[in-house]
Amino acid sequence: MTARRRTRGRAVRAGAALLAAGLLAGCGLPGTDREPDATTDGRPRDASASPSPELKDTPGSPALPSSLTSQRPDWKRCTAPPGGRAPGSDWRCTSVTVPLDHGKPSGETISVALIRKEARDKDRRIGSLLFNFGGPGGSGVGILPRAAGSYGKLNSRYDLVGFDPRGVAASSGVRCRTDEEQEQAFRTVDLTPDTAAEEAAFIEDGAAFGAGCERRSGTVLPHVGTSNAARDLDLIRQVLGDDKLSYLGFSYGTELGGTYAHLFPGRVGRVVLDAVVDPTADGIGHARNQATGFQRALENYLKDRGQDPKTGSERIARLLARLDEKPLPTSSGRELTESLAITGIVTPLYSRYNWPELTAALDEAEKEGRGDGLLRLADSYNGRDEDGRYDTQAHSQRAISCADSKARPTVDEARALLPEFRGLSPVFGPFLAWDTAGWCAGWPVDGERETPETSAPGAAPILVIGTTGDPATPYEGAQRMADELGKGVGIMVTNKGEGHGAYGESPCVTSAVDAYFLDGKVPDDGLTCG
């Protein structure tokens, strides 16, 4: 799988990375105390006291039947997920029934899984705060209990609510191949093909993946896109009893949040988008952005090690070229291929706190001729456990991405991108250029649009947080999201730092977000931290 769409680094390491937040730098440009959506104690204004227009959904979307809108969640003790442990006694789980096809709301339905930890201060409870940690394909039901320690202050007055979006894990999760098939693909498919035979195998694997999705998950597959997930989110809001949506989205979760704001601007409450996907970029644009972003992060890492960025990048590129010819052995008996090594290098670039692990893994590969460290990092990114079982985030991720995007670049188009992408990044460029063709090759479902619609005129202020050294969602994408949301809606917050996501990493950003969620204080547009 590729770096272009995955945000597992934020999800898996959320708790550990956030615990290190106190090491980061402080804040500039103080915010104001604007409270357009709050009473004196920080609660959102009651709809009866300050009515806001319930703007209609996109034209032609039928109303939901009362059997769906009148649902009341039945919260029960959570059970253990497959291969995992049940969360603690503070957590409760339920599901909400949603239309399979929001264009036919009285037709077939599916269930969306939720998990909740209730607010500690019941007397001052504000409402529900929903989370999406990215992906697409990340399981909020699985991630939130592990990351909840980072949101203790918010949990004082909010119920913390995670959910598995449609097509993910417990919400009719998409599955496309067996663990054995996945292992075989990682072992044999070259994701930077150099010959006609490698190109053919590369495209054939993409088509086989799509066929497996259709065979195993055909009913839900056409309906797993982001616009449907955003409509699910609005039904969840209603079922939970919240007049407006309070939401914290990371990475892909920012695209979901922006889509929600576009569809339901009058129902936007307090929404924060962190590590922001560029809403103006298509598939090739995202690959181009990530080639730039990951190369920038790699060069910052090399500078931190006291190395020349150009020389260090060239050295790593030579290592990858050697692996293309001859993979490295590991103690497990598996081999470290070029493609797995690229993934292993990508993984620790999501957070500077994992840079020492990258150093150890590269030293092991270059000096000792062993691939254990990079393979271990790649396995973490790819969702592989020690027993060779893979989670299904990669399956859901591709299904959602290809349901969203109309783009289906060809092998010839990908090959034509190689010179440009090598110039952007000698390490990651070829990998990302080829990924544009392999990702949705032969996909059995047409995509919905070129780029997401995120304009939200009339919505309440939405905090848009960009980190200058973010490798996966480069800073410029946050600026474009703020612009697309519209004047007075997108409130830009800049974090001068490294890594994928700023909340919990930067005390300045964290303080601004907490004040916004808890007190309704909107920071100045252009707040800069670090």
Question: What residue ranges belong to the model's regions?
Answer:
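Bacterial lipoprotein signal-peptidase II cleavage site
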Residues: 28-38, 42-44
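Extracellular mucin-like PTS domains
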Residues: 48-53
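A detector of low-complexity, intrinsically disordered, Ser/Thr/Gly/Pro/Ala-rich segments
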Residues: 5, 37-38, 56
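Gly/Pro-rich cap/lid or specificity-loop segments adjacent to the active site
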Residues: 30-33, 54-340, 399, 405-530
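C-terminal motif of bacterial Sec signal peptides marking the signal peptidase cleavage site
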Residues: 22-26
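Alpha/beta-hydrolase-fold enzymes
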Residues: 305-401
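N-terminal export and membrane-targeting signals
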Residues: 1-19, 246
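Short, charged low-complexity linear segments at domain edges
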Residues: 3-4, 8-9, 186-190, 320, ...
